[in-house]
Amino acid sequence: MFPLIILISFSFTFLSASATSGAGEGVANLSTCLINHNVHNFSMYPTSRNYFNLLDFSLQNLRFAASNMPKPTVIILPNSKEELVSTILCCRQTSYEIRVRCGGHSYEGTSSVSFDGSPFVIIDLMKLDDVSVDLDSETAWAQGGATIGQIYYAIAKASDVHAFSAGSGPTVGSGGHISGGGFGLLSRKFGVAADSVVDALLIDADGRLLDRKAMGEDVFWAIRGGGGGNWGIIYAWKIRLVKVPKIVTTFKISKPGSKQYVAPLLYKWQIVAPNLADDFTLGVQMIPIDLPADMKYGNPTPIEICPQFNGLYLGPKTEAVSILNEAFPELNVKNDDAKEMTWIESALFFSDLDNIFGNSSDDISHLKERYLGVKICFKGKSDYVKTPFSMDGIMTALVEHEKNPNAFLVFDPYGGAMDKISAQAIAFPHRKGNLFAIQYYAQWNEEDDAKSNEHIEWIRGFYNKMAPFVSSSPRGAYVNYLDMDLGMNMDDDYLLRNASSRYSSSVDAVERARAWGEKYFLNNYDRLVKAKTKIDPLNVFRHEQSIPPTLGSTQEHNYSSE
């Protein structure tokens, strides 16, 4: 079988940045180019009436919707792969930076804003959201603009014994989620979402549509967990479906109480959860609790912290309850705490859509919704834990969490399949040796934006205080919880855009990006740089934490394998 390389007919000459004599001329040139190549679904700033509706529709983090944030010159919504290719090439012809948006959930807004001062456009993939399921091969093709919820729904309509291992957020775009790995409730059984990718269609900076064979194994390896916005645009993923029983068991058990009450539960959880059979996922999150003082402390046992233990078992309720009561009797799980349902109903159950749709929340078609109408400002950070927390570490986490009653603290258990898949199998590296991952998550309403610095400083302080208890050298992080505090590409991007200076600056850019690249990708960072240099040597697809290319060699850094 020959590799798939499709070149869409397109006649133009690439222009340098100096070839456009001004912003107005640049916009006119881009508009003309798009229209001449049958791309009509776009909105220009500030003249189009629906510009801000399109900008905000998929912008999930309202930190980046503020009026002082950089705005794209044009928002383009391609309707086909031909339009997507033409869009990429028109943007290159007119020297606009490209931001690619699937679901708009980037923790640092990289799919919707650009901070380096250059004019940019958003290529929004929301119109490219088809999902085609083939039960004979037990695979599905999902276009890059499809959300996780749309993929789940399409699979469930085709089969009640097939699933896809990915995250719990139904509106999250598959393009970015899978590109960063994609951990979820089935990951202890089947690995992350990117582990299930068997082929892909990638459009590169030259407008070539490349399948796995055409892009080569180095690039195919990189797009599976190496982070979004780096390699080109994923037009479609081919994913392997996994088999699940017709009935699974779920539960959410809250154990509110004092820090002294909660700490032993968390201590036991970290011993139990990573060592359960891989059919069982038992996560825990500290959910917001903001009670008046008389309710908080007016009981014999103060209610200071509320951990919620979330469980999914690929089997019947009787087995799930028996397993937990033997391994974790302190939870005191009752039969009434657990619910039997189908896998797709469990996806709905853990999506928290009941908070939005109320009594109709059991309708699985809600998983297809792209717009839920509920948006907030948020900031996230992440960690990996390799050795069990001491009680001092747990109390540190609880004390810091209590300082922000609207925040979440999420512990995701590893082990199971995550221990069995090599750290080098795909670009996502966080495997054997990790007990659990942590997500720190501060949230606030848009009307409270004046206090955003307080929330951000809180989460930074929390993160700093947890340093003695988490992984180190490097301190691991999850690229899907993008965190600009780890460092940013800025000045070197200007140099990398200019071919004449790229040779002298590329090694510096690679070493600068190592500061966060090795936190996200550990020993896989240098291989990602090589893949980037192969597929996008001119750094067309970039953002503030993207992988830089180089034409020179880099020093290899070796750390203990995860």
Swiss-Prot record:
GO biological process, one term: alkaloid biosynthetic process
Positions of glycan attachment: 29, 41, 359, 498, 558
Induction: By jasmonic acid (MeJA).
Keywords for the protein's UniProt record, in alphabetical order: Alkaloid metabolism, Disulfide bond, FAD, Flavoprotein, Glycoprotein, Oxidoreductase, Signal, Vacuole
EC number per UniProt: 1.1.1.-
Cofactor requirements of the protein: FAD
Disulfide pairings: 33-90
Cross-referenced Pfam families: BBE (PF08031), FAD_binding_4 (PF01565)
Pathway: Alkaloid biosynthesis; nicotine biosynthesis
GO MF terms, alphabetically ordered: FAD binding; oxidoreductase activity
Changes seen on gene knockout: Strongly reduced nicotine biosynthesis but accumulation of dihydromethanicotine. Inhibition of jasmonate-elicited formation of anatabine and other pyridine alkaloids.
Tissue-by-tissue expression: Mostly expressed in roots.
FAD-binding PCMH-type domain mapped to chain residues: 68-244
Compartments where located: Vacuole
Keyword Hydrolase: no
Domain of life, per lineage: Eukaryota
Signal peptide: 1-19
Residue numbers of Pros-8alpha-FAD histidine PTMs: 105
GO CC terms in record: plant-type vacuole
Physiological role: Involved in the biosynthesis of pyridine alkaloid natural products, leading mainly to the production of anabasine, anatabine, nicotine and nornicotine, effective deterrents against herbivores with antiparasitic and pesticide properties (neurotoxins); nornicotine serves as the precursor in the synthesis of the carcinogen compound N'-nitrosonornicotine (NNN). Catalyzes a late oxidation step subsequent to the pyridine ring condensation reaction in the biosynthesis of alkaloids.
Similarity section: Belongs to the oxygen-dependent FAD-linked oxidoreductase family.
PANTHER family: OS08G0158400 PROTEIN (PTHR32448)
Protein name: Berberine bridge enzyme-like C-1
Species annotation: Nicotiana tabacum (Common tobacco)
Phylogenetic lineage: Eukaryota, Viridiplantae, Streptophyta, Embryophyta, Tracheophyta
